[in-house]
Amino acid sequence: MDSPPETDQRDTGYTLHDDYIDDPYLWLEETDGDVSAWTAAQNDYADDYLGSLDIRESLRPRFEDLARTTTYMPVKARQNGYFQRVRDADADHPVLTFRPGLNEDRRVLVDPNEMSDDGSVSVDWYVPNPDGSLVAYGVAEGGDEQYDVRVLETESGETVEELIDVGRTGPWCFGWTDDGFYYLTTGSVGDGGQLEKEVRFHEIGTDPADDWTLADEFSTQTWPLVETDAESDYVILGHTEGWERTDLYYAELGSDELHSLVVGEDALFEPTLDGNDVYVNTSLDASNYRVVSVSLDAVDSNTSSTDVGGSSTDPNTPFETVVAERDDAIAQELDVIGDRIVVKYLRDAVHELVVFDADGEQDETVPLPGRGSVASFGGEDDLFFTYESFTEPPSIRRYAFGADETTVVDQPDISTETDLTVTQEWFASADGTEVPAFVVRRSNLECDGDNPAVLYGYGGFENSLTPFFGEFFLPFLESGGVLAVANLRGGGEFGESWHHAGRREHKQRVFDDFFAAAEHLVENGYTSTERLACFGGSNGGLLVGASITQRPDLFAAAVCKVPLLDMLRFHTSLLGETWTTEYGSPDDPEAYEYIREYSPYHNVEERAYPAVLFTTGERDSRVDPFHARKMAARMQAAQSGADPILLKTRSQTGHGSGKPVSKVVEEKLDEWSFLGDQLDAF
């Protein structure tokens, strides 16, 4: 098939704030037979094109080797031993395991590979109870992030509880007690009920139909969080509105009477319970965050405790500052282990782990292997965490407090075939703001302006891009490619103020930062516009969409994954309404003006565009696949150049989680054969 399938342009549109929006592809928002047939034709066109590339099969052996490596997920320590998910080299999904000691053999508790013949069923998360005797886990199908929750007994491996069709839930809203657990349940995707939320309590051994409700009054923009602790008499309930603010409440265990802890502050509060003490990482009066604490036993339950002060001597201040804000680093997370407070900091987009005593005095800094990223840290006596960098695959590490170094518990057997160099480089954006990017390349690569390069970014929701090990980038880097990862405004790399500088009416700054990064790569001899591609997914897909519509001259190719693109209708389906705190609402006249200005779908015009590969998942329950469908159709009709506009919709996949390795390999072969062909790489 030499040209894309014809797409029916219908006489449809809608009125928004007295403006008529012509939308001939509005019908592609449906899920009927016409759309299914159109999607199948687009898949055939994309498959024909990608399948014709010789490079695709030449890359396959290396990609299979990279994918078929035993991988290790974080360790969760409990009183009776260690839980961990591990994926064997020949498996599609990781299995959930347990071992009493780190030197003992793992025993498989749950194997999702046996739950379906095609790898469509996955176990995406799990939470052991404090003594490790029980473990709850979430089971989803086709990557849709809609869960059944099952509970098994660790010793016997037997399932003792099963809650069906719980909805969009996870460990962030799950809390064990001695006799049961708090959990979030939502409506289903099919009936548009994902934004209908309820926090319930389930007592082990009882009928789930008898579960009682702790809270059910949540706005569409608000998501709850739950925090419990084995030594606490209380449960903490958080109401987080977008990425904007958090209200905190608490209740005695077993009671549905909630009391206000922090309500009405325009700041984020992330609580950790330690007995009846609450430690909170907060942005209130601290763009770089600080740690405060309070004893729930000392809080007057008849009043709303909204004063979060900075003085530990003020008797009228319920919260005391334990760890003050730093001006050179962002406090991102905390955990309490024994009498120590461990804080993960982000400084210049690289992580640090710092240990404080109970009074907030710094005891030590955990020695990390290099400039990289830390995730999933915690423990009972020792500290466990995951570490990775651009040149080191994720390893599970253990740190005994006071030691000189960390020890490796588990590490995959992946190594690069060449020496790589990583630099962090700064450049000026359109308004003069200095923005950094990591640049990864072969150490002996000549910067002669003629190397293929891929620029990756995100720039939103206070999400920070820190060093990561991308195994499928390795063949590209080894063959002389350049990878650049830009830390754009809208992210969290430099605190709440950096996030606010790139959201709502300031969203264009994110795109300008990305364009400046592209120009920096060209001006410094890393690449040329003829060999530069942009790459991003989800909110990063919006970034890619804005890049190819605003600056098609900068890029030769683009990969745009599970994207948001029709920004006048993003809020009408799935989780879109939740994101109005980040983008603004098109229903608001003021927000409508600046959103329409950059909305990629509404900025497509007849001209020559770079080659684009759009990808989406048919079971995506976050970003509606209609964004990719409508954008691909409009760009195919508008393309006056010779480069292809492709759309690949993947079956039995969602936004990204729960994807079997076999599908990951095919997806990566599509992306990198496309990029390799367009950039003359490999």
Residue spans for each PLM region:
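Non-catalytic accessory segments flanking enzyme active sites
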Residues: 34-127, 138, 222-240, 244-252, ...
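Polar, glycine-rich mid-to-C-terminal structural blocks
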Residues: 197-240
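Active-site-proximal cap/loop segments of hydrolase catalytic domains
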Residues: 488-682
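Cap/lid segment of the alpha/beta-hydrolase catalytic domain
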Residues: 113-126, 143, 401-404, 409-533, ...
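Short coil/turn segments that connect the beta-strands within blades of beta-propeller domains
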Residues: 80, 131-133, 178-179, 231-233, ...
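Beta-propeller blade signature
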Residues: 98-99, 150-153, 197-206, 249-253, ...
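Asp-box/WD-like beta-propeller blade repeats and closely related beta-sheet repeat scaffolds
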Residues: 106-125, 136-139, 143-190, 197-200, ...
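Blade-edge beta-strand/turn elements of extracellular beta-propeller
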Residues: 112, 155-166, 206-218, 254-261, ...
